[in-house]
């Protein structure tokens, strides 16, 4: 496959993951990650429930569980995809409600996905951490 073809496939894979997340298809999501995948939340653990670094498929499951228990997205826009080699950067916007408090939140985000052999090996989240912390504050 050409470099451009591989980059297009990587973007398609990222879009499939977001679709599976919207449908809460945990098994589909888990199948897309390598066994030794690493996920980096937007803040240290303790600052946000899904903060910190998560290792392996069990860590991936913990990350998505904490995220799903904390936030109820009402709008989730994927605005742009930037790709080079095995990385896909997603620029987006999200707003919704913090489940524990019922407070609204909104944030722009940047997600960086690294792919190897058709599987995600690394995921990094960047967003407005202060806005999310405020929405979760009791």
Where are these regions (language model features)?
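A short hydrophobic beta-strand element
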Residues: 85-94
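Short loop/turn motifs at secondary-structure junctions and domain boundaries
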Residues: 72, 103-105
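Low-complexity, intrinsically disordered terminal/linker segments enriched in charged
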Residues: 122-138
